[in-house]
Amino acid sequence: MGMSLSHLLIVLLIIFVLFGAGKLPQVMSDLAKGLKAFKDGMKDDGSDNDKNK
């Protein structure tokens, strides 16, 4: 039950309306930085457990 193309377009349209064209690049940049930090945190968390065993 994944998202179809029409659902994705509706979600993108809602995001565009909420944030506007000027702020959208900044929002996407912040989201990408947050995801990268989360992934790095998950990698660091797994390596700490191996060192302590």
UniProtKB/Swiss-Prot annotation:
It is a single-pass membrane protein. The keyword Transmembrane applies. One of its GO terms (biological process) is protein transport by the Tat complex. GO terms for cellular component: TAT protein transport complex. The chain crosses the membrane at residues 1-21. PANTHER family: SEC-INDEPENDENT PROTEIN TRANSLOCASE PROTEIN TATA (PTHR42982:SF1). Part of the twin-arginine translocation (Tat) system that transports large folded proteins containing a characteristic twin-arginine motif in their signal peptide across membranes. TatA could form the protein-conducting channel of the Tat system. This is Sec-independent protein translocase protein TatA. It comes from Rickettsia conorii (strain ATCC VR-613 / Malish 7).
